[in-house]
Amino acid sequence: MKSKFNSYTFYVDSTQQTINFDSLDEVNEYVCDITGVSQNQVVIVDDVEEKGHSNVTVKDKFGDKMRVVGFVYGSRW
């Protein structure tokens, strides 16, 4: 599925930084790097393509607790 966005901006809650990425996969990899979780523990809601934004959450190793680590939104520029 082709994305309707050219780039994605990720706002990191802990550092209050914004970082630009070319794809949601890159956002996912970055979240793994900064949190130490595996890719299947990162949750970026699929409705980014519809709504244009989503919270980014990570699951703990048991999958029962989730915490928000930031916010991502798409850009057409």
Where are these regions (language model features)?
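Short aromatic-glycine-(Arg/Gly/Cys) micro-motifs in beta-strand/loop hairpins
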Residues: M1-T15
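Polar/charged side chains located within well-ordered beta-strands of beta-rich proteins
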Residues: S7-T9, N20, N28
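Generic structural motif
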Residues: D13-T15, L24, D47-V48, K61
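Short, mixed-charge low-complexity intrinsically disordered segments
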Residues: V37-W77
